[in-house]
Swiss-Prot record:
Identification of the protein by name: Uncharacterized serpin-like protein FPV251
Cystines in this chain: none
Family: Belongs to the serpin family. Poxviruses subfamily.
Keyword Metal-binding: no
Cited PANTHER family: GH10112P-RELATED, SERINE PROTEASE INHIBITOR, SERPIN
Keywords assigned by UniProt, alphabetized: Protease inhibitor, Serine protease inhibitor
Molecular function in Gene Ontology: serine-type endopeptidase inhibitor activity
Single GO cellular component term: extracellular space
Organism annotation: Fowlpox virus (strain NVSL) (FPV)
Pfam families on file: Serpin (PF00079)
Amino acid sequence: MLKLICLRNFNTFSILGVVDSLNNGKNINKIISKKDMTLKEIVLYLPKFELEDDVDLKDALIHMGCNDLFKSGELVGISDTKTLRIGNIRQKSVIKVDEYGTEAASVTESCTTDGIKKIPIVKANVPFMFLVADVQTKIPLFLGIFQG
């Protein structure tokens, strides 16, 4: 199961404050694990959006030291062909968020006996960072910024 997490900087108008706070994997893991977070019921107005990206990964892999993947004869064990190599490698990512595809857009109603519960309203009408994470492994799968 996947979950969508939206992060917004309430202290400034810049999304860079959120990006700066996620400068290491520990902070992302805390967010995914719900550590140091309070569960609160809200009414969320989240814009529908669809983002698509197509990235050439060859330069990134070479920069990380994986240059042998792109040389002939370096993929022995995968095929009998001695000249097998990776010519190019690309990653295409698409994320679509709408009222049908995200739990974050739903509102849970609850009844209380001690009066009317005031539920905060949050309108995501400013830039925000989002991540999609696997609930079981707590691994972020997609990370992006919505700028409207």
